[in-house]
Structures are given as structure tokens and as C-alpha cells.
Amino acid sequence: MGVLYYSTRGDKQAYTASQAILQGLAKDGGLFVPDALPKLDKTMEELSAMDYKEVAYEVMKQFLTDYTEEELKTCIKNAYNDRFDTPAIAPTVKKAGAYYLELFHGPTIAFKDMALSILPHLMVTAAKKNNCDKEIVILTATSGDTGKAAMAGFADVPGTRIVVFYPKGGVSAVQEKQMVTQKGKNVKVVGIHGNFDDAQSRVKALFGDKELEKELAEGGFQFSSANSINIGRLVPQVAYYAYAYANLLRDGELKDGELLNVVVPTGNFGNILAAYYAKNMGVPIGKLICASNDNKVLFDFFRSGSYDRNREFILTTSPSMDILISSNLERLIYRIAGDDSAVNAELMASLSKNGKYTITEKMAERLGDFYGNYANEDETAAQIKSVYESDGYVMDTHTAVASAVYEKYKAETGDTTKTLIASTASPYKFARSVMSAIDSKYENGEDFALIDELCRISGVKIPAAVEEIRSAAVLHNTVVDRDEMKQTVLEFLGL
């Protein structure tokens, strides 16, 4: 029997992987989780002889058991191709006393490409497998990176449309330019007056709107999600942690079975949850170090056992982590509750109603794999400058948060375990913040002048994703209030 998926909130209906990917969010508002976390059937030694596509297949076949070998391998081949600027797809580099897993070599230069390059292929295959005759409408909230990566993946894919909502004024200049210049007949980008949490909570509400679901069905449409709430986003991310470990083993940086700590800059909790899944599959991962910025709701949760979003929302230089409602944490809560959906549903209801919840002591004991800390704006900038000056390596703001938290972790624990840091975006995506951190003289430079200067000082070629927006025409300029999001979707679909 293959892996089946259930809601974290109690809906007892079982779904195959393809059905869960098509639906995105469970009908009761919960997230889909596998009935049991599968194990790898290959050793790390065996994986170390494989390329990225082969490792991805070995990991993903364990979760997506209703896809045939041919279907899954075709999806992988179509995703991880020459749209990535290195054959390694996700190379690991050794700098400043750690290993940086560079997840930004895809078409939109952020780690979201690792999953969103394959999600459209998984979804179109799922639609065929399930005889879905409706057009799939991808509805996505973005804190900056998901939106562009999702649009790049779904643009002009037959049988799909995509609507992306982003917080106007809450993303970097390059992130916004990437989105509003996106081509594709099936693509719509909308700024909202509000922050990412506003966008995400309204998108979730649209998913749960039964009246809207009926209206869409009558018009020949059905919703799905490209956010990390979709299990089809999460599963491909597990692969790169297995690949990184296997590469370090191949290169003699690790001995077989030696533990590797992993640091992940964290917002919506999907990327670090993928590392947790990799550890549970058998990848020898030690501590999972959760790095937050000034929006440190996760740091407080790991320290106190209480999750409380009732606080000021802070705009930082690491906007993809400017999040107070960390959606994927729900999958971990379900797990530490012993897969008890009633406990999880009660906590999520409390979060919805009161903006907070507290886990039991028994649940907290099951968080031993995790360590949480945060880096403020000054610490983040100082880390960018420090690593650049010591190693000539330029990192983006999110990676710098992780790097700074790693230094705090070592100072606090004395742990000398070798460590992998997830490098989640190209520094070119946040050139102003990166250059200002290196030298205050760059604070008032023009965006593309700073990009050119970053190229000069780093010796790293400007990515095609940045060059192509330099002179690209703005194609999307809609900005709406939160309450107008539903109407905006209906108008785009002609309903």
C-alpha cells in the first residue's frame, strides 16, 4: 500500500499524493500530511554517486507513491534542466566555517525554484491521473519569492491560471520588479494594502469559501495552491537535504553516518520542516536550527512553548521571513501531538480566535531536534560584512540571518558539529541591503547601479533573472484592499 495523506485537523478522508497536490488545502482548513513518514531505501553512500535528479527521484518516490516511475522521472527531468545555471542544481560551498547549500541557482534566484520548478509538472500529471476536467486556478500569497517562482513555473502551462497577491511596500525592489514584469496569458499579480499575513490569511479564507468553490465549479474552475501549504511544495524540498549530505560524503567532508547540523532562515516553516522530514527519512542530520529575524515568533515558541502572533509586525531587510503566522508549523504541531488531529485542531482554533496557543510539556519534549534563535537588523548586516571581509563570500540578508544565528548557537552550546546553512536567495535579489551592509556609502545608490557594483566586488556574474528585468516593461499594476481580493479573482476568471 502506498503513502496516503490526511488532514492535520481531523477530516478522516484519505487522499493519494496526486489528490492532495491537486487540492492543496484540506477541506477542513488543515494541511495534508503523510500517514507515516517514509524511509529512504538507499544508503547515503549510494546517493553520493547520484546527480541531483537521481537523488530527487529516490526521495520523492517514497512520498508520491501513486505516481509511476515514468511519470515522476519525467516531472523531475522537466523541472531540473538548463533553467538552472549550474548542472549541480544545488551546490554546497565551504565558507566561513560552515557549508552553504546554495538554493538560488534556478530561474528566479531563490530557493522557491527548487520546488516550484516541479510543482506545475506534478500538478498537471495529477490532473490527468484523476481525470480532472476543470481548469486549475493557483491562488498564492507571497512574501516576495514564492510569487515570482510560482508564476515562472505556471506561466502559459495549459489548463492552469495563477493569481499572486503580495504586500505592496513589503518586498524588495528586485522582488517586485520580477513579479510585475511577469509574462504569461494565464498570470495575474496583485499588490494588497497590508502585510504578508493579511495576504496569506485571506487566501486561506478564499480556499475555505464554500460559496466561492461552488461558483468556480460552475465556471469550470477549481482552486489549488502553490504556497508551501501544498504537500507538492514540501516533498521536493526534502530532496536537497539528502543531496547536500550525499555530496559532502562524496567529497570527503563527512564520514558516513556523521551528524550534520542544519541552519535554516525561517518564515513559513516549510524549508526547515523539509529538513526535519529528511532527518526522519534517515539522512544523518543533528540539530535543526531555526533562524528568525526581528519577527521572532518562532524563537519565542521554541523557548517558551507558546506561539503568540499578537505583536507588532516588523518590516525588515529579510522580507521573506516577515511572517507572524507560520503556516507549516502546523504540520510539526500535529506530529509532536502524536498525530492527534483533535489536539492540533484545538490549538489552531485558539490561534485563529485568540492569536496564540501553548503546547503541553509532553509535546515540548518532542521538540528536542530543534533550536531557535534570531538575529536583529544590525546583527544581520554585521554578518554580511564580516563574512565578505573574511572570505570574500557575499550572502543575501536571509542567509545572513541564518549565519548570525549559527554563530549564536555555537557560542551558547559549544557544539562543534559540522553545519550546513541553507542559503535561500541570491544576494542580487537584495542588492541594496547587502551593499549597504558592506559599506554605508552604498545606502543611497540606484538599484541597478548597486547590482553592477555587487558584481564588481563579488566577482559573481549577474544572474539572467536580474538582467532580464533591468529594462522589462511593467505588465501588472493592480493594487487592492484586502476585502477586494475575492472580487479581483472572480474578475480575472471572468466570473
Pin down the residues of each PLM region:
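PLP-dependent amino-acid enzyme catalytic core
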Residues: M1-L495
